[in-house]
Amino acid sequence: MVLSTEENTGVDSVNLPSGETGLGEKDQESVNNLCSQYEEKVRPCIDLIDSLRALGVEQDLALPAIAVIGDQSSGKSSVLEALSGVALPRGSGIVTRCPLVLKLRKLNEGEEWRGKVSYDDIEVELSDPSEVEEAINKGQNFIAGVGLGISDKLISLDVSSPNVPDLTLIDLPGITRVAVGNQPADIGRQIKRLIKTYIQKQETINLVVVPSNVDIATTEALSMAQEVDPEGDRTIGILTKPDLVDRGTEDKVVDVVRNLVYHLKKGYMIVKCRGQQDIQEQLSLTEALQNEQIFFKEHPHFRVLLEDGKATVPCLAERLTAELISHICKSLPLLENQIKESHQSASEELQKYGMDIPEDDSEKTFFLIEKINAFNQDITALVQGEENVAEGECRLFTRLRKEFLSWSKEIEKNFAKGYAVLYNEVWAFEKQYRGRELPGFVNYKTFENIIRRQIKTLEEPAIEMLHTVTEIVRAAFTSVSEKNFSEFYNLHRTTKSKLEDIRLEQEKEAEMSIRLHFKMEQIIYCQDQIYRGALQKVREEEAEEEKKTKHGTSSSSQSQDLQTSSMAEIFQHLNAYRQEAHNRISSHVPLIIQYFILKMFAERLQKGMLQLLQDKDSCSWLLKEQSDTSEKRKFLKERLARLAQARRRLAKFPG
């Protein structure tokens, strides 16, 4: 946010072109003194910004200028004319209908004046200052239409001459409140929105132009400036038309300029520029400057402002010089940070677009091989739980473990039925299947049926977990495809198609395997030594619990009945078998899912991607980029080159 070379406005403003404006020798001598001060104090900073602008850094960052705003017919154009020495369109109503960027370039002595008006793709070369006004009017009619409409499109006026300073000025449409004639009903809102886009930039010095003969408290331009610059660090008030002040109100104007009415941190200046009558009478800019000096020197109320250095265009220019120097010094560190951040951002964005696609067919094949290998490596990292993840995110395997843990808890929940429910089930089976056994003998049929029923209820939750995990893996694999192939829509689309086909097949195989496992679980079996150990552990735990019960309250009659019947024995066997079934199912189902949905899914996808290389004719088709990818990559490379050079030049700057 450095004030661009073009922002030299302040100083240069005084450097009125004698050839074009007819300045006298004394006026030119005064101007030359100011320019000497400008060269010594501001030129190094301006040269730096000029070099950045020559690099094209302005495409990436705002290099500030001076914006002139004011109510309609406040005298904005007159102030610009006085500061720059360039005659601009004038008149009543909306004169400035497009933002006008006035870029002045100082040439060496002896070089001829030249100008250029640019808008859209049109460039109009100018050979004489008198052609400027007509060219700008044509540009405004072309952009905003013939009439009173406005546009936010820029018109650029470049003026190169030995007698102008290096500076940039922006003339914005005058603020209006009521639509007139063919103006759009919301013309006022349009203009304010347009002005705000410029004056809110920290890189812009706002010159707020206010006629001396209006109540400053009601000025819309000052209110807008204060809204975007509440501390007044970038705002200078400029009072115009002091010759139109009503008699008896002069002291109020003096109070305003002395910052006693509507406070601005940077205060006010007052100038008297050429009016419409002066233009009609063909008063030259030189004569206007002389008349201004005489007016303030002889005015009984305003001459004190001249003595304070707050009146006349030369004083305004000198003030702007000082403000510009200060603003540049404040802006340089911020500009350096902006360039650094923009460089980093562009580097990160360029990485997303990857390398340029080779033109040679054989090189294209190698390029495709590299892209597919990178994709396959990322898939391998996912499967092995070694992928890189952003802060706050978790790896694929971490998410799968959460699902598997939920599955284990689902089994526990199913097996841990309430005592009363299980007691009723056991009694129901005892009544149904008990044969000739005497009390105390375990009915194996009862035991088998209860186990089978409980395990069967886990089958559908297992299938639901399979679908959940499959979707998680599919999304993860798709993200890898987007990361590697997003700019190659045919390759990305082909990968997604393969991915979906393989997913359906693997999910189907995994489901068949899980259902087969649950069919096998209907066979009640466990290794003898394992089952004995589990049963022994259950009995020991119950014995320990019984000891605690005897030391405390007496057990219920229901519990005592169980201890003396086959019910106690059945409960012990149920608990023992369920522990082993839990261990087996909670591990085996996730193993099936990992094998089919993670391992085999990944392997088949990787092989399918490598098979794409067998079709040499499809290489170019697969590597076809998005329509704007190549342009974006080129743009980012150019941007990085500009910003890298800008950083080097800033690093060498002595300030």
Curated annotation (Swiss-Prot):
Induction: By type I and type III interferons.
Region G1 motif, annotated ranges: 70-77
Binding locations of GTP: 70-77, 171-175, 240-243
Domain Dynamin-type G: from-to ranges: 60-333
Keywords linked to the UniProt accession: Antiviral defense, Cytoplasm, GTP-binding, Immunity, Innate immunity, Nucleotide-binding
Location of region: G2 motif: 95-97
Region (G3 motif): 171-174
Biased composition annotated in UniProt, kind: Low complexity: 552-562
Coiled coil: none
Keyword Cytoplasm applies: yes
CDD domains hit by this protein: DLP_1
GO molecular function: GTP binding; GTPase activity
Cell location: Cytoplasm
Keyword Cytoplasm (UniProt): yes
Sequence segments annotated as region (G5 motif): 272-275
Region spans: G4 motif: 240-243
Domain GED: residue ranges: 567-655
SMART domains (alphabetical): DYNc, GED
Biased composition range(s): Polar residues: 1-18
Gene Ontology, cellular component aspect: cytoplasm
Miscellaneous comment: The Mx2 gene is non-functional in all laboratory mouse strains examined. It is functional in feral strains.
PANTHER family: DYNAMIN (PTHR11566), INTERFERON-INDUCED GTP-BINDING PROTEIN MX1 (PTHR11566:SF217)
Family recorded in the similarity comment: Belongs to the TRAFAC class dynamin-like GTPase superfamily. Dynamin/Fzo/YdjA family.
Protein's job: Interferon-induced dynamin-like GTPase with antiviral activity against vesicular stomatitis virus (VSV) and Hantaan virus (HNTV).
Name this polypeptide is given: Interferon-induced GTP-binding protein Mx2
Species, as recorded: Mus musculus (Mouse)
